[in-house]
Amino acid sequence: MECIYCFETVSAVVPCAGKCDALICVDCFKGSMDALDTFPKCQCGLEYSPNELEPVLPAATLRGLDAKVKQVWDDNIHTVNAVNAQIDDCKKTYLDALPLAASIATQSFLRKALDDYAAKITKTAEEKPVDCPAEFCMGFRVGGKPCSVCGCTECAYCKALMNIDKPHTCKAEDLESIKAMDSNYVKCPECKKRVEKIDGCNDMTCAYCSTNFNYRTGLKQHGGSHNRIHLTHHQNLLSVKFQHSLSPSTLDALKRLETTMNVIESPKIYKRYNKKIAYEWISKRNMSTAIRREYGNISKEISALTVDDVELHLVSVLTKFNII
């Protein structure tokens, strides 16, 4: 095997989290890692998985990797601590607003309720992946960022599809449409999707996230609509699109792959740094990112393929990530 940087023939190469074809020797990896302040990335742009690096790196290089892993861990713990501080401030604000007698009488259950409420209204480190707004793209947007597959996003004002590399000007009619929808529709208090009531009472259940709320006040409540309609998240998942075309074994493996695409939550806070836990968490996070990007690329490539070619292509990708 030949390293893409030094062109030397080597027996051991550094494995990429995205399983790309870039072959990098250990010496070149160490040089690139030492030259960067951030966590090392492969030529394809994905961060390496620490668990996959550990078996192939010598002790001296591993010490440098350990420092990078701890830096990423510490940065995330700092973010988690900042979020928890925001939640505590939010709880204190609500408790301080209560009369003393009411505060004492309700503390037993109010603090738990405030924990849940404050966590939802406080900006957290985790971001839910959102479907790309482009009609035929299977990528995801995380934290309001453009889709990592096609680069598209939505204008924050007119909600029109736009590409970050091209200039965009809001159309007057689009702004008027958004204004009309805001005045005629109610947003779900959980997922913020617009909901329209055709008839009946004000007890509603969001079809997207199953949250019960009152249509008049827009606030959550225990009871919901009588005739509930639930929309499956990401209706254009490949497992849904090809559920009647793929073999049962490939379809089952594809569904397992889709369950690994979730954004990995920030780690729990421990009293002492645990290297094993840090390696495991960062490896899962980086692998999840790699699979999400690969999944989006698959969806673009198979649009012009026959069903048989789709099956072969999917089997190749599933094998690459050790799903089958």
From Swiss-Prot:
SUPFAM superfamilies: RING/U-box (SSF57850). It comes from the Viruses. InterPro entries: Znf_C2H2_type. This is Uncharacterized protein 073L.
